[in-house]
């Protein structure tokens, strides 16, 4: 339930549940999660102002989590040239391969292109490697085959994104690896929980980081994960896109809807508990202007464009234009690529997909490919980076400013990297901290150092707009 609570999809669900009670009466609602930082608020999201009981199991899991910073070795030089990868990344790959010898391993990465980059280079390094790549842009059949092979033990390691973070039973997992920072403690806790999936078993995880800031952020998150300091779920307050979506959907389904029924039902949904009659009137007026509904007295009915919107916007998941990718040798669909990436392709180009290299044969309604040997271009997918909580960024910055590594679950090598990083910044001048924003000036570049987490992205956009007009 934590995945829904803070999103527009969750707000859509909350109104939909209230609409369902009009048809079926009140019913039992059960929300499951292992990583809720604010159980009381999330329970309110699920049931509104109804009575609710929060059940927390008394059994605590044993967790073994450590941050590693594998050091490049001289033997990696040839591999660096062969794989076209930085020494630190090659060292991380080598460590991951060695660690996975412990048993069935899930190697989590944060993006689909990182999964592909790791998968194809692992296969180039070791063609007999027992690995599969798993992410949401691969076809359903490919993902199911990967899960089945892992369950049966014919594949030892799955390189995966959040596609395997929740819900799916992949059987026994001895070790969870996380490549670079997991970005927040709730996500790391969820991923770590995939290992040791039996009562009294220890969940074992290792975060493999490749550079200083990743090591620092990973160490802070690992500490928070082990101490149970999970980020609070922030419920979106009255997202208007959701409100418009549900009003249009409702009028399409019920033809005529009483305005008071709209108001009373929507207010019962927790994200819209502060919803007012004035809010409703403003939204109905807006939808009327764009021909999505018509208000006649106290009733609201669908507008001339409502049906088209309804069928094109059932979900609030952003709709990205994609095309299928088919293996010409087997005629099987292996996944989907964003059209923006496909526009730059021509027959003969090499691309990386499913951890392997493919040559583009034909581009029509779908992309036809055949297996290839040489390294190709990584696909580009439109998506959002996983946000970094403000509290994580603040703690990381304060520890760096103080040179304080106490209580961080990291190896000696990782600690040495952090200490060296702290000393190099101190030698350069002013140390950035939560109280001190610093600016680095390079030849054609300014870097603002401020520990705002993902909030810094908003600040960057505002500064860019003020300075450059975009």
Where do the model's predicted regions map?
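Terminal, basic amphipathic appendages of nucleotide-handling enzymes
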Residues: 227, 239, 320, 363-438, ...
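Conserved small/polar residues in nucleotide/adenosyl-binding loops
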Residues: 460-467
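Active-site phosphate/pyrophosphate-binding segments
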Residues: 242-243, 247, 253-278, 417-448, ...
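Phosphate-interacting basic helix/loop segments used at nucleotide- and nucleic-acid interfaces
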Residues: 92-93, 151, 157, 161, ...
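Long, charged amphipathic helices and adjacent flexible linkers at domain junctions
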Residues: 233, 307-309, 425, 432
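Helicase motor core with emphasis on the C-terminal RecA-like subdomain
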Residues: 1-254, 260-296
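Conserved nucleotide-binding/hydrolysis modules and their immediate coupling elements
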Residues: 289, 295-392
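Generic beta-strand/beta-sheet core signal
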Residues: 32, 108-110, 160-161, 171, ...
